[in-house]
């Protein structure tokens, strides 16, 4: 089985950080969905340069509505969401690829609905991580409720 993982992002005026984020996942995600909520900078151009499917969504001051719109465009079996300033560390890429292999090996009935991923915050000037916690970052597409 070859299950796909779609990266889904909502962005606005993220030209300073978006390229770094997309570079960190370009070899991990099978598809990149970038939903722009009204950028006036080069955000769209940068996303398109990485081969992302870029769409527009009028901002209604509702992150969940924009996120769900992004999810609705994805064709993958699993949806990975990141913010534009998030990065998958190089040291974690092999672990991510092993996760994809494990997902491909599982029968449909055993697939998880949610996958929690480590999330590093509070990185100091020397690069030391001050805090790591787990966040839901990957969800199974067909397990999402239709709202």
List the predicted regions and their residue ranges:
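Extreme N-terminal starter segment of soluble prokaryotic enzymes
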Residues: 2-6
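Conserved donor nucleotide-binding strand/loop of the catalytic core
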Residues: 44-69, 73
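A conserved acidic beta->alpha catalytic loop
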Residues: 24, 36-48, 59, 83
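Short aromatic/hydrophobic "clamp" motif used to bind/position activated sugar donors
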Residues: 79
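Conserved beta-strand positions in the Rossmann-like core of class I SAM-dependent methyltransferases
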Residues: 33-36, 55
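Short, well-formed alpha-helical segments that are part of the catalytic scaffolds
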Residues: 9-31
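Residues that flank catalytic or metal-binding motifs in active/ligand-binding sites
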Residues: 28, 50, 132-134
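Catalytic-site signature of metal-activated, phosphate-bearing donor transferases
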Residues: 64-71, 88-147
């Amino acid at each position: 089985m070859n299950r796909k993982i779609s990266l889904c992002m909502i962005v606005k005026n993220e030209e300073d950080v978006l390229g770094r984020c997309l570079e960190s996942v370009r070899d991990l995600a099978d598809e990149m969905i970038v939903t722009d909520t009204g950028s006036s900078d080069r955000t769209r151009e940068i996303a398109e340069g990485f081969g992302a499917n870029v769409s527009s969504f009028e901002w209604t001051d509702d992150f969940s509505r924009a996120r769900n719109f992004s999810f609705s465009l994805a064709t993958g079996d699993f949806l990975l969401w990141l913010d534009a300033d998030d990065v998958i560390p190089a040291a974690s890429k092999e672990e991510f690829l092993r996760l994809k292999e494990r997902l491909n090996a599982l029968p449909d009935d055993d697939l998880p609905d949610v996958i929690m991923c480590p999330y590093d915050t509070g990185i100091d000037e020397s690069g030391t991580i001050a805090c790591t916690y787990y966040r839901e970052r990957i969800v199974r597409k067909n397990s999402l409720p239709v709202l």
